[in-house]
């Protein structure tokens, strides 16, 4: 236990989550059909296997954008399939939203680090509140 009461396991878990965010947001658009886009995660082979248990949060974050129907992570091929309502969204809007999420994470690393001691649910609620505020500020529905 360190000075702040943080255990090695907690630091390890935070580093896994941080690695997932930082590596996930380096992607290429490999397929772009109306209503369906596929992204290739650039460094997916470097993601620790433990990150797979957090994919539900990535899905929830992406699906907060109105018009996203389904998000599927494929950890074998390193792709993310996003199915969306082509009458509500364009792939450019989705990519802009993903950039907004990346900015949110990078701008709030201090906040994320200071969530030590909170339950997983509390952390998710806080981060989703911050995301919703960012979305409002940047005119995302």
Regions from the PLM with identified roles:
Residues 40-41, 50:
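Acidic, Ser/Thr-rich low-complexity segments on the non-lumenal side of membrane proteins
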Residues 2-9:
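Long, charge-rich, low-complexity intrinsically disordered regions
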Residues 54-58, 94-101:
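Short amphipathic alpha-helices in soluble, non-transmembrane regions
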Residues 84-89:
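Helix N-cap motif at beta-to-alpha junctions
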Residues 9, 14-36, 47, 103-141:
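C-terminal low-complexity, charged extensions that often adopt amphipathic alpha-helices
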Residues 36-39, 46, 58-79, 83:
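Short acidic amphipathic segments
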Residues 12-19, 49-65:
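Short amphipathic alpha-helix segments
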